[in-house]
């Protein structure tokens, strides 16, 4: 309620109490009455604003207590990378680091750009090979794969290959024996995607006359449920992120389980005896040829959109940072200062290498991670108080100006200019969201010890939209050496901490569905929470679709129709939109109680 309306209501109430007609004007009374009413109305208006601010802070604090950090906190971006290792049979480490540089545009000054280092690390400790898929043959064509983005035809068959037959030529640079060969397989036609991957799982793969075991997934075992970590670790947010990313990319990875060797390839493959008899590749001795037999329904029109790649793995926008501190006394506080966002604690070790952050009843040293305030209900930190001070000075400038005098006016003008500059700086630095975490280390005996503190940082949404084909610099790899690292997909999925409005939406969704997705209303509720302002409507209907298999008929489906909001801010790229759609369907398949398949249809 604004000041004029409050003043009008007070005046009408006063007229009734004084026995006057309510239609009497304010000018009918002494001017002091109008001044008093204006002063009271102004203070009541300010009281109303203060009450609304108090309610808002209470709601925000309650939501912060209700939601854990993995729901409301910052989330890193992720992508895929392909490397060319220089060693034989190397294994990745989660601490390997890749770096690129991104140009960050200052929205307050578009002519001023900032170069920021964006770091990525693997999400899985997969095994790599010093090998490369260099040739692919199907139909009438023999193609050379220059890179993930470019393929060149180098031969034409005298007699076309059988329908549904595809050959891969893998160049082995040093390795004579290859085991657990992991392929990343992708198709750049969304309409053929479901059709191709269904038949890929039914395909047979041969090395010579021997049929090989070809399975979906990575060449290392995934630990989706780490029981030991759940029991002993206090902080495992990053493990959940690893699991989420690995599950997202798992359908695109296939592993050749058995060992293959160049020594077993004693004669020319049949492809060079019957289809390309005069091609020079028939004499190459460092290429292993694999034959894949698909259904005859897969023709060259499908195969020309398919790519097979080695030495690919998911990466996530995180950077490992270590801090060494010497502690003394029974209580010590270590602040974690960084320009990037704190994501998760890795470990805290003493001089002997013992983990201090693990749960252990016999341990006399406790380590607790705190974020923001120290468990107070009123958690207004310095940044919030500064924002309040800025608003207060601006609101009270009129009261100071009543003192009069040139000196006073100049002083107030200087204060206002400084406040405006400080406010602009706080917006540019995103100071309102500053919340530096810190470690509270307590010791029962107060002994002096040295601590090795390792933690993970991320740039959040700034890690999004790193373009495909970007060359990554090897920043930190103690056990591996790479000659090249190239990003295959745009990075996406990074976000900043949820706003109060987003937290309210999350809370409402949790209260309505209670974490279950059973009814159409649950699906619609989850869709609104997942897509947020990027869609303008969602509708759930029953439908049918033709099965992909040859012998299958029609099956029932649950069709989800979404209307994309073209005016959403900030605008989404096609890669980010596709990620939202794919992750939405993946979550429904894993958490929904419905037995019918889902179809997502854009209106």
Describe the role of every protein-language-model region:
Residues 1-603:
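Intrinsically disordered, low-complexity, polar/charged repeat-rich segments
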